[in-house]
Amino acid sequence: MLEQLQTLKNEAETQINEASDLKSLNDLRVKYLGKKGPMTEIMKQMGKLSAEERPKMGSLANEVRTALTEAISSKQQILETEAINEKLKSETIDVTLPGTAPSIGTKHLLTQVIEEMEDMFIGMGYEIAEGPEVELDYYNFEALNLPKDHPARDMQDSFYITENTLLRTQTSPVQARTMEKHDFSKGPIKVICPGKVYRRDNDDATHSHQFTQIEGLVVGENITFADLKGTLTVLAKTMFGEEREIRLRPSFFPFTEPSVEMDISCFKCGGKGCRVCKGTGWIEILGSGMVHPNVLEMSGIDSTRYSGFAFGLGPERVAMLKYAVDDIRHLYTNDLRFTKQFQSTETGEI
């Protein structure tokens, strides 16, 4: 048994020293020190020895087990250190290599269209008015001639937060708030109201549950329909080209009377008829009209003395028509490949 223990020790230590990875080392531990290993078998045979031999052989067996355990532990530390060093080496970053340049953002197409319209109206003497996106039901509907039982409320589904508050469905509430607090001793009202609006539409190529609007409002003495037509003509020619013609069609909006929708001559075919204008030669752009007397009175304005006009359009629609964008969702995906198509790298302009 003495020779057997010595042979086992030499053989095991040789294999432990030659182990190249932690898995191989663990296999050797199981092989020599496991429940079915030779060391266990030797310990079981101790009972067959004489009383004189048993202490000596037991002590030697324990020394061999201890030596193998220490050899495995020492080798394990070496292999773990080597593994860590190899990992660090493979993950080393060469700081002298050129870095990956971050993608540079550009001004969004929708932002550019909105700013273009804002600049145009500011040049015409308009001011920019803003209001809350979480709006009172009163300003979103009732102040705009849509009482609680008005059938026109069924024309648009809304995101209600409480019984009396909702995400505004239009920027018209800003007009109502502006009229309510305006002091005509300082001049007429002349504002545009750009901002986000929300409706319960299913998102598709032409609809979005969140989009933007720009509405305009002018209220003062002797404001006529001719003033509205002149303003819309300037808007059409500025945004779509000097050669554009406009057409006004009778329509209905609860907050204006009379109400009209404005079409422009197709910029693609020049009015001859094509896919863009659906063969009609005209493209619908916006809704407008003279401010309804009820709306003026609700805001505390004397409708026998003051009159006004209002209009509203969607910058998304303008952008899609002007730059041939076929899906409104492209405007909201934050894809730089899309955005950069509409911006000059030198001037930052469209």
Curated annotation (Swiss-Prot):
Cofactors named for this entry: Mg(2+)
Alphabetical keyword list: Aminoacyl-tRNA synthetase, ATP-binding, Cytoplasm, Ligase, Magnesium, Metal-binding, Nucleotide-binding, Protein biosynthesis
Family matches, as InterPro entries: aa-tRNA-synth_II, aa-tRNA-synth_II/BPL/LPL, Phe-tRNA-synth_IIc_asu, Phe-tRNA_ligase_II_N, Phe_tRNA_ligase_alpha1_bac, Phenylalanyl-tRNA_Synthase, tRNA-bd_arm
Co-factor binding comment: Binds 2 magnesium ions per tetramer.
Catalytic activities: tRNA(Phe) + L-phenylalanine + ATP = L-phenylalanyl-tRNA(Phe) + AMP + diphosphate + H(+)
Domain of life: Bacteria
Broadest EC class assigned to this enzyme: ligase
Residues noted as binding Mg(2+) in the record, renumbered to the chain: E257
One cellular-component annotation, GO: cytoplasm
PANTHER family in the cross-refs: PHENYLALANINE--TRNA LIGASE, MITOCHONDRIAL, PHENYLALANYL-TRNA SYNTHETASE
Stated family: Belongs to the class-II aminoacyl-tRNA synthetase family. Phe-tRNA synthetase alpha subunit type 1 subfamily.
Protein name as annotated: Phenylalanine--tRNA ligase alpha subunit
Gene behind the chain: pheS
